[in-house]
């Protein structure tokens, strides 16, 4: 069934941080929605590129050779194999487009790893 998605309404349903939800599917990829605040772990993805789109807020992506600041309406693609660390001083709403096999923590498995993201 084809249906539209209201991004604002979907984000209102998310009440926690660093727990990506599936907002849609595109071929072999998920469109994930997540609220974040604070710092995440350094990690990389061995086999998948990862796209971060900032819907609300300001996101800092730390890289081993610097950092990139993303504001509302901006996105970045982190190529596979590149270590990165997302940081949000204030609450940030992100859309992520990534293959279904992508773990949110990449090559690291810990208490923040979401093995089976739920739909929203």
Report each predicted region and the residues it spans.
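A cytosolic small-molecule/anion-sensing beta-strand core signal
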Residues: 27, 55-56, 71-72, 90
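Conserved short histidine dyad/triad with adjacent acidic residue
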Residues: 16, 30-46
């Amino acid at each position: 069934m084809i249906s539209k998605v209201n991004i604002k309404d979907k984000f209102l349903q998310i009440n926690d941080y660093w727990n990506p939800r599936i907002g849609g599917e595109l071929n072999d990829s998920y469109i994930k929605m997540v609220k974040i605040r604070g710092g995440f772990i350094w990690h990389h993805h061995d086999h998948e590129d990862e796209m971060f789109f900032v819907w609300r807020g300001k996101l800092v992506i730390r890289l081993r050779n610097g950092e990139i600041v993303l504001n509302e309406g901006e996105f970045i693609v982190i190529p596979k194999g590149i270590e990165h660390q997302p940081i949000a001083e204030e609450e940030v709403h992100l859309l992520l487009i990534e293959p279904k096999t992508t773990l949110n923590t990449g090559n690291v498995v810990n208490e923040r790893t979401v093995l089976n993201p739920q739909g929203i």
